[in-house]
């Protein structure tokens, strides 16, 4: 009997020790490579570190293509736990090169699709945390001063009235711009799509190196119109800038994603970050004025401002084209 009691105590102690070790493993440095600007990463970092005591999120900011290349070049001595970006095709590239590892998030309340697009990778290598749409942002004061009409479609930006008034990020450096170009080509067809893109290009005043260089130029009035991902415009509006935004009929809604990097040095910390980002608390952080992203948990929209876009209920967004 005494032996059985001793064995039970030992098993109980081992279980407690394992749970403590699991909690400790979530703490420490969690390193993420991301294309997102500090306006997005700083609020998430603060909320995550508060939710997971002892965790320290180290943010390495690189544009999407540079981030992919960095993970390729450092795979032998990888020191990164997570990759966090908007463009789904970047995650497919990393997955194809076996630079991501599988995981099964425990978070609930997230549907399988946003519009026609799956939120998570079907093989479990990356996970949508926010929905993203692509469109046209413009500065109302600039537009009035320069007598610009309100753009509604991509073809509008090819009209003579917009000459020298449009900004875009280089698609070779920006994953979101690359996806926008892909959406136009898929939606309009190869020949018509390229004609639209080339005609718009004739009106470009600047081509920035980073995606967030475009909204910065529009917000300041340096240029009048920008081709952007939606949350750049929504966060600018929340900050009081005189800007408007429209989804052209040829556009799409796709998830922005997060993934655990293969051979992540802090796998438990990476898992904790994903669970936080997909939890109600993490999803609510996306509603903050400096972020203004579209959560993938439909229930979170109950806490959003009245005019907040909702891809799960807004018929305008539901009609946007599927993307492959």
Specify the residue positions occupied by each region the protein language model found.
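A bilobed periplasmic-binding-protein/Venus flytrap-type ligand-binding module shared by bacterial periplasmic
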Residues: 137-142, 254-269, 286
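Ligand-binding "clamshell"
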Residues: 94-102, 121-123, 235-247
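C-terminal capping/gating helix-and-loop segments adjacent to ligand/active sites or protein-protein/ligand interfaces
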Residues: 289-295, 299, 305-324
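Ligand-binding pocket segment of bilobal, Venus flytrap-like solute-binding proteins
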Residues: 183-247
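A structural signal for short loop-to-beta-strand junctions that line the ligand-binding cleft
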Residues: 78-83, 101-140, 155, 164-168
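Early extracytoplasmic/lumenal segment of secretory-pathway proteins
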Residues: 26-92, 215
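Short helix-initiation/N-cap motifs at beta->coil->alpha
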Residues: 61-69, 89, 155, 201-216, ...
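Periplasmic-binding protein-like
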Residues: 165-169, 276-297
């Amino acid at each position: 009997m005494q032996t059985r009691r001793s064995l039970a105590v030992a098993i109980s102690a081992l279980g407690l020790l394992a749970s403590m070790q699991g909690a400790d493993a979530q703490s420490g440095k969690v390193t993420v490579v991301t294309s997102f600007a500090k306006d997005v990463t700083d609020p998430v970092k603060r909320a995550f570190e508060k939710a997971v005591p002892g965790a320290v999120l180290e943010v390495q900011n690189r544009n999407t293509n540079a981030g992919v290349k960095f993970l390729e070049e450092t795979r032998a001595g990888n020191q990164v736990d997570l990759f966090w970006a908007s463009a789904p095709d970047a995650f497919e590239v990393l997955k194809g090169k076996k630079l991501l590892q599988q995981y099964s998030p425990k978070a609930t309340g997230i549907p399988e699709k946003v519009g026609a697009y799956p939120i998570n990778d079907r093989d479990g290598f990356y996970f949508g945390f926010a929905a993203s749409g692509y469109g046209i942002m413009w500065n109302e004061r600039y537009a009035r001063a320069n007598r610009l009409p309100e753009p509604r479609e991509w073809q509008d930006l090819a009209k003579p009235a917009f000459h020298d008034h449009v900004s875009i990020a280089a698609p070779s450096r920006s994953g979101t711009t690359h996806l926008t170009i892909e959406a136009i080509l898929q939606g309009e067809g190869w020949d018509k799509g390229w004609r639209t893109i080339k005609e718009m290009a004739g009106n470009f005043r600047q081509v920035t190196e980073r995606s967030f260089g475009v909204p910065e130029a529009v917000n300041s009035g340096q240029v009048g119109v920008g081709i952007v991902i939606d949350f750049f415009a929504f966060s600018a509006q929340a900050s009081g800038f005189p800007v408007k935004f429209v989804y052209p009929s040829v556009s799409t809604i796709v998830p922005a994603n997060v993934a655990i990097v293969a051979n992540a040095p802090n796998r438990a910390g990476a898992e904790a970050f994903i669970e936080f980002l997909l939890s109600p608390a993490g999803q609510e952080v996306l509603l903050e004025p400096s972020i203004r992203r579209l959560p993938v948990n439909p229930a979170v929209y109950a806490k959003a401002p009245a005019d907040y876009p909702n891809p799960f209920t807004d018929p305008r967004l539901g009609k946007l084209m599927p993307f492959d």
